[in-house]
C-alpha cells in the first residue's frame, strides 16, 4: 500500500499538471479568438510590427469583441463603437482600471505617470487635480501660447521648410512646456526640446517592446538581474533622467512663483495646491511634466499625418484653401473663425481618424467579473480599445484609407461633445480614449490642431517633391508607419512653399506682431490678455458636466 506522503505528492503533481495545462487555453465562455497553445496561449501570434493591422484582421475574423490569451492573462479587444460605449463608458465604474504595466509605470515612471496609474486613491486625487488644471474655463489661459506657437511654426516653415517635421514637434512640445512649466522651447534645435523628443521616443519604444510585454505577463521574470534584462536597465536610466528634467523645471516654477514672475501653467497651479493636498515635490514635478506629455506627441503625430495626407490627396488642400480665402481673405485665421470654417473642422476630424496615433490605445482593466453579449469577462482582464479597427471599419467609414473630410459634412461636434454623445455611432474618433480615462485636455488639442491646419493652408501650398533623376512626383507611402505605444508616419519629404509673396510677408509681419512680447531669450515678458478670444467658443457647461461625470 502506497505511503500517504506518496499519495499526497502524486495528487499534488496531478493537480499542478492539470492547472498548468489550463494556462493559455481559452475557456469556453470567453469571447472567441485565435487558436491557442498550452502555456503561452496566443503569445506566439503577437506581431512584432504593425500590431494594429493584425488586431484589425482579427476583428474582421472574430467580431467586435474577441479575446487574446496571453500566458496567464487575458485581453479583451473591443473593436466597435457600441462595445466601447457599453463597457468603457456605461460601465466605467468597473472598466477604468489599468493592467499592471511594470515597465511603463513602475520602472520608467516611478509609479507617478497618470496615464498608466491603476484605480486607487492617488489616481482619484490626480484626476481631481487634472480637472482643475485642464478644464474648459482654465485652459483658455493657454490660448495665447497656442496663438504664438502657431505663428512661430509658420515662420519655421517659411525659413526652413525641409525641416517641417521638427517644426511640427517644436510647436506641440513648446505648447506642452509652457502649459506644464511656463517656459518656451523657441528653436527646433533647442537642447531641452531635443531631450523631450528623445525621451518620448524612448518611452514609446520601451513600453511597446517585447521585453516589456514579457515582464508584464510573466512577473516571475522580474527576479532576473538587470544584466539579463537590458530593457529594464534602460528603463531605470530613463526614469532618473526624466525625473531630473521635470524636477529642474518644477523648482524653477517655484522660484518664479515666489518672485512674482510666474506665467500661467500647471506647475504653478500645483504649487499653489501642494499645501492643501500634501504631495511631494517629486510627485508634483512628475504630474506637471507627464500630464500633457502624451497629448503633445499625439497632436504632433496627427499634424504629421495631416501634412502627409495633403501630399497624397492634394484635392483636399485646394478645397480647404478656397474656404479659408473666402472667409479670411488676406487675414491670418484665428479661433474666432472656427464656426465659419466647417471644411477645416472636417479636416481636423478626418486627421484624427486617419492617423490616430494611439492605434490600440492604452489598455483598461476590469476590476470585477462581468458579462457582455453572453461572454464572461473575468476580473483583471485587460481591455484593448482597438482604435485603428474602429476608425478603418468600412461599414462605419466607407473607403477608410481615403482622407475624405466630406464624410464629416454637417457634424458640428468638437471632440468633447462627440465623446459624450449617447449615440456611439455619432462619435467621430477615439484618439482621446473613453470612459473615466478620457483625456481631459482634448479641447486644448482641438484648438492646437485647428490653428495649425487653418494657418498652414492659409500661408502655404504643400506639394509633392519631384525626383531629380526620374522627374516623377514622390508620393509618401501611407503604410510606412513607425511602431510603438504610439504609431506615426515614418519621415517623408515635402515641398512647402508660400502661396504668394504677400502671404510670406504676412507671415513675417504676424510673427513680428507678437515677437515684441518676448524677451531676449524668446520667453514671455507678460502673457497678453487680448489674445484669449473669449468670444470664439461659448462655454458649454452641459458637456463640461458630462465629461466630469465620466472622469
From Swiss-Prot:
Keyword Ribonucleoprotein found: no
Cofactor(s) required for function per UniProt: heme
SUPFAM superfamilies in the cross-refs: Cytochrome P450
Keywords: Glycoprotein, Heme, Iron, Metal-binding, Monooxygenase, Oxidoreductase, Signal
Pathway(s) of this molecule: Secondary metabolite biosynthesis
Signal peptide per UniProt: 1-25
Binding site for heme: 439
Keyword Metal-binding belongs to the record: yes
Cross-referenced Pfam families: p450 (PF00067)
Superkingdom as given in the UniProt entry: Eukaryota
Top-level enzyme category: oxidoreductase
Any one Gene Ontology molecular-function term assigned to this protein's record: iron ion binding
Glycosylation sites: 392
E.C. no: 1.-.-.-
Family recorded in the similarity comment: Belongs to the cytochrome P450 family.
Biological role: Cytochrome P450 monooxygenase; part of the gene cluster that mediates the biosynthesis of virensols and trichoxide, fungal natural products that contain or are derived from a salicylaldehyde core. The pathway begins with the synthesis of the reduced chain in virensol C by the highly reducing polyketide synthase virA via condensation of one acetate and 8 malonate units. VirA has interesting programming rules since the first 2 ketides are fully reduced, the 3 following ketides undergo beta-dehydration, and the last 3 ketides are only reduced to beta-hydroxys to yield the trihydroxy portion.
Name of protein: Cytochrome P450 monooxygenase virE
Gene: virE
